[in-house]
């Protein structure tokens, strides 16, 4: 168990690591040859130009201005200088609201920490509960004297913790309500002021029913011309182009290798590069690399054209789904937010994501299989969570010197050294846990993709939800259980049964030391490592040396990245959970969390301004999830405090805590009804106002050309591929774009005397058979 000395060693290691990362960043960012790594967002906006194009030879690569080294920390005030409205214009509402999560952490925990340290810490410190606990052989450390563990059973001092629990709850709820109100207003204002985008006029229609007499495209056109005659404008059916997309990706990879060997040959024309054609180039016949890849690209071009023809001619490649666009935002809002058919499983509509946000491969998944896929992933996630208890138990064994000596007695002579003991107990458990979790976000994202979500934002939200549940069960509850009940097992066996609940009550707060070490590793050094961008830095210079030939190549090599919401938001929620749980129990943990929120806010604000380039904009659609998880953490903290006090003989004060979860739950229901609709539905009033203003400003704007190809699959947007079929089936009038489309007659036949024979697959005439 970590002592105050162990915590001090861990703090020194992590602070030193964070300082090294920040100093390295401050120096590397001002070097001209790293400019594209640390300021890629400004290059993508066309505002910043490369310093390598001007100046003396040395100054093109190394910053020789000594004054800039004296101002190496000026990135900190610069990161805080940009006001929020300008930040929204610069990076989008998603990025600005994401930063507000860190601000909420500061708003909640700074006042709570001041209150806890001024009231709870003196109350805990002046008690003598741990001296009595030693008589029952319960292990503890110096840091536990600052926690609730140091209060004697049945003491009236527990009333202080009860009052503080109410104060913490009311303050947290107040901050959450104000933030929910603020973010909801920001979202509505953002949507109202947003520039014209295709997704504002478009809905995604899924589970289009099969018709034996009409193709999917004709069915969609007929349905919306009949049911939305005044607002329907155009549509684009969805294709299963996954095989074609795979070929296009393969061609792109092959082209990169061709570029690499051509560049290599231009630098040294005395030797033509050669490769082996076998597996990974390890064996096989040696051939000319350039000729080989030129031949491969020609072969892939032929395969791509064949696959395109197949998609064009094969009606089975058309999925029962379509992107349907309307003449007005009002029409799209009505369609997206209403039931289209008496059968609630058909003609399912939802707001279309941005075209750049669509996860095209999942649109090819049959809608009827989504339920089965999600059931499979629920089961897989259960087993993933369950079996991960094994590494969690291993991590907790590292937090105990006794456990290490028992499992690895040959290390006893090494770990008995005071310095090694401090490093092992204060630093090693946190870093090992972080290493175990490093691939988890990617695994959860793969699971979300398998479930069939069709937008990047929905994929990230589902992965974030699962990551949050995983952290709650394994990282938090798993660490507490394996770190308290298991390590006190010997004590349990030697005492009477009625003493066991008291021992558990004293032991639970002891795990605060482990979480403190984890916060320092992940929240201090980890955040400082985020701003250094070591991996993108290395890969940029490798690509710049081996592959880059043009400015476009150099731009693609920048890799600005983005906020990985599915990985970062659950991590933030873990800190909310730890802070709310331990605020009335072990307040000494709160300063470590506050440092995390402050440092993370500074770092991510800098990254959002200068580095990240978001793939999509959801207008803060994720905020209800953020709010709900903080509420969940608050309720969990209240329940755990009740359980803890019930083992401490606080029979008089504990029942008063029963009201807290009830109050919190009804507060959540109030916020859900008051603010959440702004994130789920688009008001028709605002849609009509925006349509009216736009028509007044641009009365002659032709919306059809703007929308008609907005949602064509990216593999059909190549410059060398134009196909009139997509004009023909996209559902817009091609005779004259200024004329209104008229209702086309349905191709369905009467079922009274005619058998239901499909005519959609007939390649010849589409007219009804003669009688």
Swiss-Prot record:
GO terms for molecular function: calcium channel activity; calcium-activated cation channel activity. GO terms for biological process: pathogen-associated molecular pattern receptor signaling pathway; stomatal movement. The keyword Ion transport applies. GO terms for cellular component: plasma membrane. Keywords: Calcium, Cell membrane, Immunity, Innate immunity, Ion channel, Ion transport, Membrane, Phosphoprotein, Plant defense, Transmembrane, Transmembrane helix, Transport. Phosphorylated at Ser-54 by BIK1 in response to pathogen-associated molecular pattern (PAMP) perception, promoting its activation. It catalyses: Ca(2+)(in) = Ca(2+)(out). The modification Phosphoserine is found at residue 54. Residues 751-771 have a biased composition (Polar residues). Signal peptide: none annotated. Pfam families: PHM7_cyt, RSN1_7TM, RSN1_TM. Residues 744-771 are annotated as: Disordered. It is found in: Cell membrane. Activated following phosphorylation at Ser-54 by BIK1. It is a multi-pass membrane protein. InterPro entries: Csc1-like, CSC1/OSCA1-like_7TM, CSC1/OSCA1-like_cyt, Csc1/OSCA1-like_N. Preferentially expressed in guard cells. Belongs to the CSC1 (TC 1.A.17) family. Calcium-permeable channel that plays a key role in plant stomatal immunity. In response to pathogen-associated molecular pattern (PAMP) perception, phosphorylated and activated by BIK1, triggering rapid influx of calcium ions across the plasma membrane, leading to stomatal closure. This is Hyperosmolality-gated Ca2+ permeable channel 1.3. It comes from Arabidopsis thaliana.
